[in-house]
């Protein structure tokens, strides 16, 4: 367990290295460049890919398996190697798990098994302390990090799990998308569904349908405002899915979800962290979300908070700094930027105590 002062220093250095608006050149001059290597990971579908970022020297390092969700810009989005290098320079061995399904803009419950296998691969890497390994995920990858942390094969060996901008329940997320409504205890507000959210939604909802009907629905509902394709000739299961691709009044979403095919609803549960939180054994669970996130509404993380509040080791933070985990898209006044960055250091700090 790292001392509090040392952990605070590492967390601060990590934030300076991660955030593009902050000067990181001094850190780069004072420490050798991290090492990056591509690895092949075990997968239910055969072989998966991962990227390992490690400090240039030293052993006995904590490890973190990263699930970064759907990245439209692909594997070389500039923030991804920046994150890996920042973690490595701060002392972690970081393994980025690349999900073939998420690269195809789909959610697949098999990713939970594959992420758990990636975690075990991380624990066996040279220079890694297997007792100080955890998981971290962003966006839908954050939800899968929570699901993997509850996986029976690894849950007793996960030292921490952290997330940023996850969803809590596929069902509530589907209801929000279908109704174009953000729902919270304070009331309901209209929501303009982000194009990325919509693309993943349509591809995930149609994934188990017959290929010809799947392709028809994907083509007919390419954007949230697409003109609906004809329902003629669709089977009962495809019609049930199609109903939720059209705008549905919020009060009708429960009925519409209940009418989905059994296999679709089974997959919903397998991919919903709220259904698996009791399986998490990690002593540290960290959740963060931007209040104005347009891709996954903050209400999803608030549902996690409601279930986890009071649990020892649980930390929750809301930010006004990011645009869906991306710190480059907002311009804040200097004093507000300073406050938000300080908040982010405090959010990250517990992870550096491991």
Please name every model-derived segment.
Residues 280, 286-289, 293:
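Short beta-strand/loop motif that positions the catalytic acidic residue
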Residues 9-59:
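N-terminal cap/lid segment of alpha/beta-hydrolase-fold proteins
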Residues 269-284:
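Conserved serine/cysteine hydrolase catalytic core
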Residues 56-87, 98-99:
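Short, surface-exposed "cap/lid" segments of acyl-processing enzymes
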Residues 133-142, 290:
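Conserved alpha/beta-hydrolase "nucleophile elbow" surrounding the catalytic nucleophile
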Residues 147-237:
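Alpha/beta-hydrolase-fold enzymes
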Residues 175, 233-269, 302-306, 310-354:
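C-terminal catalytic histidine-bearing segment of alpha/beta-hydrolase fold enzymes
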């Amino acid at each position: 367990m790292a001392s509090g002062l040392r952990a605070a220093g590492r967390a601060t250095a990590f934030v300076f290295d991660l955030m593009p608006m902050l000067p990181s050149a001094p850190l780069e001059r004072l420490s050798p460049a991290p090492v990056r290597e591509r690895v092949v990971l075990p997968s239910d579908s055969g072989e998966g890919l991962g990227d390992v970022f490690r400090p240039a020297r030293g052993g006995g390092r904590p490890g973190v398996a990263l699930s970064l969700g759907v990245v439209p810009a692909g594997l070389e989005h500039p923030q991804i190697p920046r994150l890996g290098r920042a973690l490595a320079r701060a002392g972690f061995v970081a393994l980025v798990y690349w999900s073939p399904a998420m690269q195809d803009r789909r959610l697949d419950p098999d990713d939970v098994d594959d992420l758990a296998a990636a975690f075990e691969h991380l624990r066996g890497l040279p220079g890694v302390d297997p007792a100080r390994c955890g998981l971290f995920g962003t966006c839908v990858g954050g939800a899968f990090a929570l699901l993997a942390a509850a996986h029976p094969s690894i849950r007793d060996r996960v030292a921490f799990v952290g997330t940023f901008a996850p969803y809590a329940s596929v069902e509530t997320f589907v209801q929000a998308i279908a109704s174009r409504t953000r729902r919270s205890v304070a009331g309901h507000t209209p929501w303009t569904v982000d194009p990325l959210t919509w693309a993943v939604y349509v591809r995930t909802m149609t994934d188990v349908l017959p290929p010809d009907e799947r392709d028809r629905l994907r083509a007919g509902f390419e954007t949230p405002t697409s003109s609906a394709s004809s329902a003629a000739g669709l089977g009962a299961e495809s019609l049930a899915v199609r109903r939720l691709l059209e705008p549905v009044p919020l009060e009708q979403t429960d009925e519409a979800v209940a009418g989905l095919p059994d296999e679709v609803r089974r997959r919903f549960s397998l991919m919903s962290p709220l259904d698996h939180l009791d399986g998490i054994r990690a002593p540290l669970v960290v959740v963060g979300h931007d209040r104005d996130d347009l891709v996954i509404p903050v209400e999803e993380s608030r549902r996690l908070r409601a279930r986890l509040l009071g649990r020892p080791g649980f930390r929750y933070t809301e930010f006004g700094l990011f645009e869906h985990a991306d710190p480059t898209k907002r311009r804040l006044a200097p004093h507000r930027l300073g406050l938000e960055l300080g908040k982010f250091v405090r959010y990250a700090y517990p992870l550096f105590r491991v």
